[in-house]
Structure formats: C-alpha cells, structure tokens
C-alpha cells in the first residue's frame, strides 16, 4: 500500500471522516420506485378492506381490488365505483338481451299495516328465478312499491286499489338503502345474472278500519332477508269487509286467496247469483275450491265477512297469452 493511501486510512480510523475529494466518502445513490397508478398494498388492513367490500357488494375479488386501487383504498367510494361500473355493464347487457322471452320469474307479496302489495318480476329461466340475486331484486321491487303506496293519501271510509305497469314500476325510487330507481336495480341484476328481465307489474291495496286483506301465494317461500315478503308463482289478494274482529280472519283470508288462485274468477259476483253459465267466472257462485259441494258464497256467509274485491297474479301469464295469438 502506498504511503499516501496508508495515511488516508489512518486518518479515517482516527477521526471518522474522509478527506475532501476522497472517493471513499461517496455513498451509493438512493434507489426510487415509481408506480404507473395507485396500488393496493398487501397489508392486513388492505386485505380486510377487500374482504369487507366483497361481502358487502357480492362482486368478484378482482373487481373489488380494482375498485379499491382506483379509489385509493376508500371503501365507500370503491362501493360507488363498483355499482356504477356494474350498472354500465348491466345496461349494455340489457340492450343486447332485449326481446328475449321472459316467461319465468316470481310473484312477491308484502304486507305492512293496512297496505298490501303484489309484484311480478320476470326472467328467462326457472334456474335464475331461484337465484338469491334475483330474489333480492323482487324484494327491492316490493319495497319500492310499498314506499310508493305509503306516500298516497288514505281513504277514510273506503279501500283503495291501484296498479303499476312496467314503465311506472321502473321509475319508482329503489328504496331507503339503494340509490337510483328500480330500473337501475334491474340493470344491476341483468349484469350479474346475464338474462333478460322485466319489472312486469304491481298491484297495491290500502284498507281502512272495518276492512282487511286476505292473501295467498302458491309455492310460497320466504324472502332471504325480509321475513314479511313471500315469494311464489301465483299470488292473490282478497279484500273483505267485516263488522267484527274475529280470531280466524287470517285463516279465512288465506282460504279465499287459495280459491282465487285455483279457480281464477273474473269478478266477485253476488250471493244471489245462480251457479252455471256466466256465473262460473263469478267468485261467489263458483264451487268452493276446498269443498266443491258448496259455493264459495255459502262458505263465506257464516264467517261474518263480505268479499268486495280481489287481485290475482299468475307469473308469466301475459307472455303465454302472447305466444298463443
């Protein structure tokens, strides 16, 4: 080692510093990493956010991760972003699937207080009608219809009944926990399930004191998350007037609903109608479904109730009629 280099090494050992201009004092340049866009870290908290978003929205892990990356880890904004993207995809799919037959689906019946609603949502296959996501769509439509009815003014002395067609139903607000309209919820469901779907129709009834609504859904199953909502393929509401509150009114109402579903009357008729002829389509003069030896009127009379109106929905009945024409 040269004398000059030996002196430099000795100086560093004694003072801990380098002489000016020495190559030994130069340190490696810092390294930098650049990212083309936001990146979700692999930390435990990020994984927890990803799982939470996945559980809340039901979208794939890939899409949830992309949403969190796009929104910088903001859970609320990521959820909004996901819904917007899903809606875009849903509208695109809806346009492609428009015109395909929707003979399957579900009827939904929901009762709250003095208000009862009956809704029909159609899809292409029975397989999709049994899917949880489709059932949640029917639930949302029933809730949206119920909210609409609750904004209407009550009639103090008479019942009120109304119908909503597909266009009117689509324009209703989606509900307290959803943004946009029912049409937006429909687009989301189409995007997720990949079938053509239609918000077919809805009926609602509001009754004052002295009236009650009997109801029945055939092939009934409970909604996955709303115990008051009943789902099935046929549904009926029967509006009755009674002067006294009896304990068996609910059972009588269910039996009347069964009759309407099974016998498909076209009108109520009167107790004076004779059986046969045109009376066969009148509810009170039809043979009682559960005991054909008597008419429905003969069953009702001793129960202390008067049948004043009814609504009957059969899933896909409009589609079937169109095919036979």
Swiss-Prot record:
Keywords: Cardiomyopathy, Disease variant, Elongation factor, Mitochondrion, Phosphoprotein, Primary mitochondrial disease, Protein biosynthesis, Transit peptide. It is linked to Combined oxidative phosphorylation deficiency 3: A mitochondrial disease resulting in severe metabolic acidosis with encephalomyopathy or with hypertrophic cardiomyopathy. Patients show a severe defect in mitochondrial translation leading to a failure to assemble adequate amounts of three of the oxidative phosphorylation complexes. The modification Phosphoserine is found at residue 270. GO terms for biological process: mitochondrial translational elongation; regulation of DNA-templated transcription elongation; regulation of mitochondrial translation; translational elongation. Disulfide bonds: none annotated. Gene3D superfamilies: DNA helicase RuvA subunit, C-terminal domain, Elongation factor Ts, dimerisation domain. Pfam families: EF-Ts_N (PF25025), EF_TS (PF00889). GO terms for molecular function: RNA binding; translation elongation factor activity. Associates with the EF-Tu.GDP complex and induces the exchange of GDP to GTP. It remains bound to the aminoacyl-tRNA.EF-Tu.GTP complex up to the GTP hydrolysis stage on the ribosome. It is found in: Mitochondrion. PROSITE patterns: EF_TS_1, EF_TS_2. This is Elongation factor Ts, mitochondrial. Belongs to the EF-Ts family. Expressed in all tissues, with the highest levels of expression in skeletal muscle, liver and kidney. The modification N6-succinyllysine is found at residues 76, 133, 192. GO terms for cellular component: mitochondrion; nucleoplasm. The modification Phosphothreonine is found at residue 324. CDD domains: UBA_EF-Ts. Residues 1-45 form a transit peptide. The keyword Transit peptide applies.
């Amino acid at each position: 080692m040269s004398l000059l280099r030996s002196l430099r090494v000795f100086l560093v050992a004694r003072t801990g510093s380098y002489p000016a201009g020495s190559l030994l004092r130069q340190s490696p340049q810092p390294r930098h990493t650049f990212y083309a866009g936001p990146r979700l870290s692999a930390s435990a908290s990020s994984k927890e956010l990803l799982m939470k978003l996945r559980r809340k929205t039901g979208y794939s892990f890939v899409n949830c991760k992309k949403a969190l990356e796009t929104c910088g880890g903001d859970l609320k904004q990521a959820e909004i972003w996901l819904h917007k993207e899903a809606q875009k995809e849903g509208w695109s799919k809806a346009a492609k699937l428009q015109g395909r037959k929707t003979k399957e689906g579900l009827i939904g019946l929901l009762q709250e207080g003095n208000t009862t609603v009956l809704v029909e949502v159609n899809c292409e296959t029975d397989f999709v009608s049994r899917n949880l996501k489709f059932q949640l769509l029917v639930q949302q439509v029933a809730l949206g219809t119920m909210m609409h009815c609750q904004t209407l003014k009550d009639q103090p002395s008479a019942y009120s009944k109304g119908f909503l067609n597909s266009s009117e139903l689509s324009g209703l607000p989606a509900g307290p926990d959803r943004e946009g309209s029912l049409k937006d919820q429909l687009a989301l469901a189409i995007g997720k399930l990949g079938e053509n779907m239609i918000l077919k129709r809805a009926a609602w009834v509001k009754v004052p004191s002295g009236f009650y609504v009997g109801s029945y859904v055939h092939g009934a199953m409970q909604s996955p998350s709303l115990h008051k909502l009943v789902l099935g393929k046929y549904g009926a509401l029967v509006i009755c007037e009674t002067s006294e509150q009896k304990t068996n009114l609910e059972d009588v109402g269910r039996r009347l609903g069964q009759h309407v579903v099974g016998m498909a009357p076209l009108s109520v008729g009167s107790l004076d109608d004779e059986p046969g002829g045109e009376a066969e389509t009148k509810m009170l003069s039809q043979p009682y479904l559960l005991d054909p030896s008597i008419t429905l009127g003969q069953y009702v009379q001793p129960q202390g109730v008067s049948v004043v109106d009814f609504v009957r929905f059969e899933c896909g009945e409009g589609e079937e009629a169109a095919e036979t024409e």
